[in-house]
């Protein structure tokens, strides 16, 4: 089961989740610093990323893990407030530049291609104080930050992700309020944030295109989270339509403007407009793009970056009471099949990734696809022999192989989440996704490979699984 020659095998991390050094060497506070320091049990046991894996001082240890796996690519994110403490280029923190220069240079010296995310949920607190992603002013702030990163690191970094999981960020931070700033705006905030995230991404892509691409010759995209959504009853027309609506609200709301035509899907526009009208709003709760904005947004990604973990079943759920919320706008409910095995929210459904990749190929004109995250957690305490977890990866690789060989999907890179056990947002350190175990009780934060790491290293060496289909 050999993968195509030159296939990229990677692992991923994100700044707030691994670095620690939350106020070291001039770093400014980010929204997760503020959110976790406020307590209130919004994060498991009020844990914080103040130290996390200590990667800010232990990069050499991370590099050893990367080399041990034999990764061809490594995906990590830049901390916006480590580079620009107040989020603007008014003050630039040289120590932050030095840290990321060392990571990039060490990777390249070791034949590893960096995939760099500009922004992975950790907005500078100074910008959140000015309205964050609910304010249109953020578009220019993000563009200036992106240009700063392109000009500082782009001579060596050729693969960029502007915004990590924009579709998760908009809902979790500004609709449900489960991520910072922690204030829910049901049925309104998520759409407002999405609108600004899409425009900020597009602006920064154009900046790269016009100012840096000719010289640097890199690629820029954003990453989107996608659960595969299957009709609960495949024979029910209403469930089939609900599943289509679900994927449209979940993925296409972001992907269609960027990859196809600069505008939201029709079903999203009509559902939200109709619900808004019933609820007495003077206009739709979904903002509209101007014709000029549509032109600016269309075609602003050089590859399709998607993050897949699991699958859900979908059925039609009429919004009789006119409740506010994204699920209510889509008129769906989702749930797992009771026969699926799971840890936390991740149910083992390997065939979902193949269906998702085929959907992206068919809907988005057969783009180059990177899976920028995929993984399976263990609950804490986690055994080092994680043979069961490796089974999730093994079955996933079988499905990726089928997608490439049988469906002719143009998948070029796979990133396992994560290189290290780390701070998993609201779950704190209770959910361990690492290929390497990290002892969070030990100040030295030793990294020890799980069985999965050893097995993944074999896959990378062989460029695929040894077994047949």
UniProtKB/Swiss-Prot annotation:
Its main location: cytoplasm. GO terms for biological process: beta-glucoside catabolic process; carbohydrate metabolic process; galactosylceramide catabolic process; glucosylceramide catabolic process. The active site is at residues 165, 373. Pfam families: Glyco_hydro_1. Belongs to the glycosyl hydrolase 1 family. Klotho subfamily. Keywords: Cytoplasm, Glycosidase, Hydrolase, Lipid metabolism. The gene is GBA3. Its EC number is 3.2.1.21, 3.2.1.46, 3.2.1.45. The keyword DNA-binding does not apply. This is Cytosolic beta-glucosidase. InterPro entries: Glyco_hydro_1, Glyco_hydro_1_N_CS, Glycoside_hydrolase_SF. It catalyses: Hydrolysis of terminal, non-reducing beta-D-glucosyl residues with release of beta-D-glucose; a beta-D-glucosyl-(1<->1')-N-acylsphing-4-enine + H2O = an N-acylsphing-4-enine + D-glucose; a beta-D-galactosyl-(1<->1')-N-acylsphing-4-enine + H2O = an N-acylsphing-4-enine + D-galactose; beta-D-glucosyl-(1<->1)-sphing-4-enine + H2O = sphing-4-enine + D-glucose. GO terms for cellular component: cytosol; membrane. The N-terminus is blocked. GO terms for molecular function: beta-galactosidase activity; beta-glucosidase activity; galactosylceramidase activity; glucosylceramidase activity; glycosylceramidase activity. Substrate binds at residues 17, 120, 164, 309, 417, 424-425. It is found in: Cytoplasm, Cytosol. Neutral cytosolic beta-glycosidase with a broad substrate specificity that could play a role in the catabolism of glycosylceramides. Has a significant glucosylceramidase activity in vitro. However, that activity is relatively low and its significance in vivo is not clear. Hydrolyzes galactosylceramides/GalCers, glucosylsphingosines/GlcSphs and galactosylsphingosines/GalSphs. However, the in vivo relevance of these activities is unclear. The keyword DNA damage does not apply.
